[in-house]
Amino acid sequence: TGWTTVYRDEGQTVYLSDDGSVYVPPADPEPVTPPEPYVPTLAELQASKKQEISTACEQAIYSGVSVTLADGSTEHFALTEHDQLNLFGKQAQLTAGVNQLEYHSDGQPCRYYSAADMTTIITKAMWHVSYHTTYCNALNMWIVGCESAEEVQQIFYGADVPEQYQSEVLKAYLVKIAAMAGDDVKDAQTA
């Protein structure tokens, strides 16, 4: 006895109370305003873009170069840091007067290369690494020169670097690349 107050009525189930209390549903929560999305600072965007460019540069270098050898065959050589160190060692062997040098192209067994072929491989590899390093440096200078997030976001690996951010070295590389492209066009026209 004493359970005479309807505490809560859920349709088929009725709860009673013995102290006269009545169920009061909790108040609806206040709507939660979603937080504003985080907007990185210009310095944070620049740091992130530099990391993106650095990674792309490393991938471009590591992908390596294809080299046409004296016999007319073309072989591809990856240029990871380990590969680059090996090639510097081969350069020392060349300086010492070695005429046949053991090395291997991607996915191939080790074989002997003539001093002339090894010189060609090393020259192309060093050019490839130096160009990409120089290009990456110019992109980083461009990133630092940006004054807005929009400017930073427009930069990507492979973009034409504005002249004001091109070093003397990059300009020389670009002239050489244009000349090589011109030679390819001439070769294609005469073929």
Model-based region annotation:
Residues 2, 7-191:
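A preference for well-ordered globular domain cores
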